């Protein structure tokens, strides 16, 4: 489907699959900036899961928040944070798998929500958590809690182009994507801006503008289109992480909470690998 205005494709899997024969390939070719699946997860369970995270002590204590200066808290294992020490990374990932076995008890499993919807976008592919040849599994997803002031400047996410993690099996994939499930917005009054996706794939030519934080000027001068993704709790979206993208700063006392994954795919590979 031609997308001359470069808008996200939404609001459900049926619309996405009727628009593209091979949705994941359409994302790879940036025919659309994102797939948004509204109400993919039960919004009522989102609020109750947040309460569970608080009860387990995963979030800042409201009575001590001024003393706790952390801009972000992660529940889960991040290759970006721990990949420099593979032994520590896989040990930590094993603990995450154990935690996620009971963390969502009594609720619809948000992890299953992401994986099942991803499978719908990848016809003929086997979606599973990434692993090494020896069977060591990566973390299946990560829950990120973003507090006041936390933002992400224009950047890309890529195990090779950005992080050069060529010792890990996921470096073999030609394309990398992300899936983000909104559990709570910073602004509880309505839809919140989760990201701005620019119609610009990373190249070495673009890197100087990222390093000098002048990409916004470059985008204006070159009339690069962008798509702003706004989600409500329970909404899920997928996008190509080689697109230059940014996330606005959190404002206020209520954190933004998401469950996120990275996704690896190659046309000739039957596997779709998922990790965090």
Language model region names:
Residues 1-26, 144-157, 223-244:
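Generic detector of solvent-exposed, compositionally biased contiguous segments
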Residues 1-101, 105, 109:
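N-terminal auxiliary "cap/dimerization" subdomain that precedes the catalytic jelly-roll/cupin core
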Residues 23-24, 127-132, 248:
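Catalytic micro-motifs at enzyme active sites that drive phosphoryl/nucleotidyl and oxygen chemistry
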Residues 32-34, 138-140, 174-180, 192, ...:
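Extracellular structured ligand-interaction cores
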Residues 39-41, 142-147, 158, 181-183, ...:
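Short, flexible loop/turn elements at secondary-structure junctions
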Residues 85-148, 164-165, 171:
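Signature of the catalytic double-stranded beta-helix
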Residues 148-227:
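Catalytic core of non-heme Fe(II) oxygenases with the double-stranded beta-helix
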Residues 207-276:
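Catalytic core of Fe(II)/2-oxoglutarate
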């Amino acid at each position: 489907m031609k997308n001359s205005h470069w808008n996200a494709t939404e609001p459900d899997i049926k619309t996405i699959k009727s628009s593209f024969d091979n949705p994941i390939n359409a994302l790879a070719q940036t025919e659309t900036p994102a797939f948004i699946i509204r109400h993919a997860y039960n919004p009522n369970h989102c609020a109750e899961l947040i309460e569970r995270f608080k009860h387990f002590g995963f979030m800042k204590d409201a009575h001590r928040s001024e003393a706790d200066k952390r801009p972000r808290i992660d529940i889960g294992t991040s290759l970006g944070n721990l990949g420099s020490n593979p032994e520590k990374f896989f040990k930590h990932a094993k603990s995450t798998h154990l935690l996620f076995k009971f963390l969502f008890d009594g609720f619809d499993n948000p992890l299953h929500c992401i994986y099942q919807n991803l499978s719908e976008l990848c016809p003929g592919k086997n979606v599973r958590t990434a692993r090494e040849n020896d069977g060591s599994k990566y973390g299946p997803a990560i829950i990120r809690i973003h507090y006041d002031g936390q933002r992400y400047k224009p950047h890309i996410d890529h195990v090779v182009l950005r992080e050069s993690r060529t010792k890990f099996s996921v470096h073999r994939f030609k394309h990398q994507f992300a899936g983000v499930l909104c559990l709570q917005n910073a602004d509880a009054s309505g839809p919140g801006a989760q990201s701005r996706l620019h119609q610009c794939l990373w190249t070495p030519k673009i890197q100087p503008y990222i390093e000098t934080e002048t990409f916004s000027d470059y985008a204006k001068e070159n009339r690069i289109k962008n798509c702003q993704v706004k989600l409500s709790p329970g909404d899920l979206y997928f996008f190509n992480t080689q697109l230059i993208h940014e996330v606005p700063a959190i404002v206020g006392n209520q954190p933004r909470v998401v469950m996120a994954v990275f996704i690896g795919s190659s046309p000739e590979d039957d596997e779709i690998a998922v990790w965090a």
